[in-house]
């Protein structure tokens, strides 16, 4: 298989886990750099002057190169949109339509082909903005058949599929619905999913219901995730820490004991600033979490209701401007920490440009990663590579 040398890289963000020990800082930056790709993996990284020969040569033109973004939280399998709801929210006027239930109805009415085409467009949109790995949830079907087919659609685009039958409590008996989620729905979904998720929030699923659903998922071989503490203080974050979940998402309203639980458990707090941007709600306090020693990831939460953006560069800019993160912390959170939030940061994983990792990368039309926050709204991703191939 042909090897490729990408040289004349002005700034190479490696996310080398050993970088902090040798003085290269959080991002493991190498200046005037090069990297060699062999097949789908990174084979060599270092100074351009020391680069070995390869079969093909690519000149980066002094641009910055960084690991592809890892979007560990999205809801891409849906039909229709809720633009009227967004416009009403921005105008501060009441909106009487059905919210998430509008999306559920449209998704159930769509064909598999329509859903697949829609997800393909969104994934391509993400790729153009540097995202190389995306997690995709179900959650707009809420029947045995529609949850299973939503996951089957998602599986065409990613291995990181998440069963979110516990997205909203339908009309009727909540206990009966939990039984449905943990029984027939889980049985139908498990073959298409790697993860199971619950929206643990006041007005949705409480901590006891979330625990029951996550326990059932674990018994079926699915790893647990959790939406928690988005709308108010609650038990969800502490439940995630108690269960040792790899990540818990939103984390907007946190008591001191929530922060301590995240720190002590090692559970990653995945922050979703696009939601707060799109809903005019308070942003999570990333600075507080980082200073407490909590691991923080960033993701898009791309969905038709609370956050219809697929742009990780926008999320990075918001995290820096509104949540107290440095540009380096935000880039690290959207790459390496995102990989950790999907438990994909191992020797042959993603989220870093070091030998043995998958060659997923973004080439910026800028000399430094700082420009992602410095120039918000500018399409800075010049080219995206996935598994060693340029798109």
Swiss-Prot record:
The keyword Transcription regulation does not apply. Pathway: Amino-acid degradation; L-histidine degradation into L-glutamate; N-formimidoyl-L-glutamate from L-histidine: step 3/3. Fe(3+) binds at residues 73, 75, 227, 301. Its cofactor is Zn(2+); Fe(3+). It comes from the Bacteria. 4-imidazolone-5-propanoate binds at residues 82, 140, 167, 230, 306. Its main location: cytoplasm. Its EC number is 3.5.2.7. InterPro entries: Amidohydro-rel, HutI, Metal-dep_hydrolase_composite, Metal_Hydrolase. GO terms for molecular function: imidazolonepropionase activity; iron ion binding; zinc ion binding. Binds 1 zinc or iron ion per subunit. N-formimidoyl-L-glutamate binds at residues 140, 303, 305. One of its GO terms (biological process) is L-histidine catabolic process to glutamate and formamide. Belongs to the metallo-dependent hydrolases superfamily. HutI family. Catalyzes the hydrolytic cleavage of the carbon-nitrogen bond in imidazolone-5-propanoate to yield N-formimidoyl-L-glutamate. It is the third step in the universal histidine degradation pathway. This is Imidazolonepropionase. It comes from Nocardioides sp. (strain ATCC BAA-499 / JS614).
């Amino acid at each position: 298989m042909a090897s490729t040398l990408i040289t004349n890289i002005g700034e190479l963000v490696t996310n080398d886990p050993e970088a902090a020990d040798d003085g290269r800082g959080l991002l493991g930056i190498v200046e005037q750099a090069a990297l060699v790709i062999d097949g789908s993996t990174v084979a060599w990284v270092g100074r351009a002057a020391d680069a070995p020969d390869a079969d093909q040569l690519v000149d980066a033109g002094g641009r910055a190169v960084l690991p592809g973004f890892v979007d560990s939280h999205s809801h891409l399998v849906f039909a229709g949109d809720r633009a009227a709801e967004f416009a009403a929210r921005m105008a501060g006027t009441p909106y009487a339509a059905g919210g998430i239930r509008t999306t559920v109805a449209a998704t159930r009415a769509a064909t598999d082909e329509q859903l697949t085409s829609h997800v393909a467009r969104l994934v391509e949109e993400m790729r153009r903005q540097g995202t190389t790995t995306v997690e995709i949830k179900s959650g707009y079907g809420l029947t045995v058949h529609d949850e299973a087919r939503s996951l089957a659609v998602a599986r065409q685009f990613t291995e990181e599929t998440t069963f979110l039958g516990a997205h909203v409590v339908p009309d009727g008996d909540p206990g009966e619905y939990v039984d449905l989620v943990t029984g027939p729905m889980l049985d139908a979904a498990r073959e298409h999913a790697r993860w199971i998720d619950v929206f643990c929030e006041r007005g949705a699923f409480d901590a006891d219901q979330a625990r029951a659903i996550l326990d059932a998922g674990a018994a079926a071989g699915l790893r647990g995730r959790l939406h928690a503490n988005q709308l108010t203080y609650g038990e969800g974050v502490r439940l995630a820490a108690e269960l040792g979940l790899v990540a818990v998402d939103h984390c907007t309203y946190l008591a001191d004991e929530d922060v301590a639980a995240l720190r002590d458990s090692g559970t990653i707090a995945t922050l979703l600033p696009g939601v707060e941007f799109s809903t005019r709600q308070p942003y999570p306090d990333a600075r507080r979490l980082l200073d407490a020693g909590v691991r923080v990831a960033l993701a898009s939460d791309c969905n038709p209701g609370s956050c219809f953006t697929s742009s990780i560069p926008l999320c990075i800019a918001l995290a820096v401007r509104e949540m107290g993160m440095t540009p380096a912390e935000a880039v690290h959170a959207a790459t390496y920490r995102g990989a950790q939030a999907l438990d994909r940061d191992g020797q042959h994983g993603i989220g870093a440009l070091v030998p043995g990792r998958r060659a997923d990368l973004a080439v910026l039309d800028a000399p430094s990663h700082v420009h992602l926050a410095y120039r918000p709204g500018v399409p800075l991703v010049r080219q995206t590579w996935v598994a060693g191939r340029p798109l």
